């Protein structure tokens, strides 16, 4: 198999293999089916390139255009799409069953900020020593987080015990 053209690029000028092509002019007008060599000559006359637009068509559809400009516009579109793409992160807040009110409010403020930024938030209650006997206190704290963030988040994953911890996941409610 010949490898004249890298897989991600389009064929242009002499790289086009077909003998005849359906030609589209620089302004988008149909010029009909002509030989590849005539099409290349026509493009060179105008100082432009012959670019294969639809290789699978019979005969292939080619367009007279400035390949450098075309490539630049494609790159810009790709960058723009990448910019619009958001990466959702999982932030974690750790609390203890004996967390005091002020500390709870600080942690709650952090959770609310994470959710407003569009990140998922994992709330973990970790137990030390004999505290594990009082799992109900941990569940109470997790329920309180759910109640205090119900305007911003929905419960994504119910509270579950894992070793010496209780964990739950909050996901932001999508903005409309």
UniProtKB/Swiss-Prot annotation:
GO terms for molecular function: ribosome binding; translation initiation factor activity. Its main location: cytoplasm. PROSITE patterns: IF3. Pfam families: IF3_C, IF3_N. GO terms for biological process: ribosome disassembly. GO terms for cellular component: cytosol; membrane. The keyword Signal does not apply. Gene3D superfamilies: Translation initiation factor 3 (IF-3), C-terminal domain (3.30.110.10), Translation initiation factor 3 (IF-3), N-terminal domain (3.10.20.80). Belongs to the IF-3 family. NCBIfam families: infC. Monomer. IF-3 binds to the 30S ribosomal subunit and shifts the equilibrium between 70S ribosomes and their 50S and 30S subunits in favor of the free subunits, thus enhancing the availability of 30S subunits on which protein synthesis initiation begins. This is Translation initiation factor IF-3.
């Amino acid at each position: 198999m010949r490898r004249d053209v890298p897989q991600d690029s389009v064929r242009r000028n002499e790289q086009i293999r077909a003998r005849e092509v359906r030609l589209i002019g620089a302004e988008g007008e149909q010029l009909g089916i002509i030989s590849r060599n005539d099409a290349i000559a026509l493009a060179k006359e105008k100082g432009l390139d012959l670019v294969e637009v639809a290789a699978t068509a019979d005969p292939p559809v080619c367009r007279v255009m400035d390949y450098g400009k075309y490539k630049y516009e494609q790159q810009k579109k790709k960058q723009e799409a990448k910019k619009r793409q958001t990466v959702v992160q999982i932030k974690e807040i750790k609390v203890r069953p004996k967390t005091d009110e002020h500390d709870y409010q600080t942690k709650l403020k952090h959770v609310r900020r994470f959710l407003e930024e569009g990140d998922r938030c994992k709330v973990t209650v970790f137990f030390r020593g004999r505290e594990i006997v009082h799992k109900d206190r941990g569940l109470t704290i997790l329920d309180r987080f759910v109640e205090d963030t119900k305007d911003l988040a929905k419960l994504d994953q119910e509270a579950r015990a894992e070793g010496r911890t209780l964990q739950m996941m909050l996901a932001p409610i999508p903005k409309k």
